[in-house]
Amino acid sequence: MAFLEDGNHTAVTGFILLGLTDDPVLRVVLFVIILCIYLVTVSGNLSTILLIRVSSQLHHPMYFFLSHLASADIGYSSSVTPNMLVNFLVERNTISYLGCGIQLGSAVFFGTVECFLLAAMAYDRFIAICSPLLYSNKMSTQVCVQLLVGSYIGGFLNASSFTLSFFSLVFCGPNRVNHFFCDFAPLVKLSCSDVSVPAVVPSFTAGSIIIVTIFVIAVSYIYILITILKMRSTEGRQKAFSTCTSHLTAVTLFYGTITFIYVMPKSSYSTDQNKVVSVFYMVVVPMLNPLIYSLRNKEIKGALKRQLAKNTFS
């Protein structure tokens, strides 16, 4: 049942997710592609987590945050991808009212945690390059745990603002969501109640988090760049740059896409463009992160080779 009679109006008890396409051939092709991407995402990020756990050479703050970033990537992708895959296989993909709220909240939670972790990693690089003598004090285990806990608290608060706003909306008419998951913007369009406050609160919290984390990342890298340019040693410059390139690549991919969705005016792009960009940052980027860090980071590659050699000769 998608509708429930309640007094003088009909309340929506579930939603129909329209997905990415109605073309049956394209649905099969997309199912295979996205399933492969999801399997690579889970296996790649799990491998990153396990490698960091078992390699003593990687027991540093940067890799501590990277392991939790990998966990967030798995959660982020898993919040929408399994349901998207089901959508390709069934003629009409329905999701309950409660399930929609849970999916929205989990996607926002893991996405927000990723924002904070990327900012924490930028701060870590700033301390390592600009204040190397104070690194052990400023990035102690206690500080790392505090930054991690702060990331999860920030994720919880932002997710709460979205889910509470969603549950405050009243749906009494159309229940067809023009998306492949329960994104907040298309849900607001279906509401038959006043959306002025419920729509503003999540936008404010999400926008504030994006601005604050981008500010931390930008300031960190400005100081890093200034410090690198002051270095007299070419080898020192190259080493400093190499420790930042993988993180900068991940930041550019993630923030570039979420800025398109949440910062640019809605009139500047269509719903179909929104869907494509959403697939990129919710499905593709979580797959790319472990590849970026493993291919561009010498310590990760070195630890991987040592573990492979150990397993081969053991």
From Swiss-Prot:
GO biological process, one term: G protein-coupled receptor signaling pathway
Membrane topology (Extracellular): 1-28, 79-102, 158-199, 262-274
Species this chain originates from: Mus musculus (Mouse)
Pfam family, one: 7tm_4
Primary gene name: Or5p76
Membrane association type: Multi-pass membrane protein
Protein name stated in the entry: Olfactory receptor 5P76
MF terms (GO), sorted A to Z: G protein-coupled receptor activity; olfactory receptor activity
Cytoplasmic topological domain residue ranges: 50-57, 124-136, 221-240, 296-314
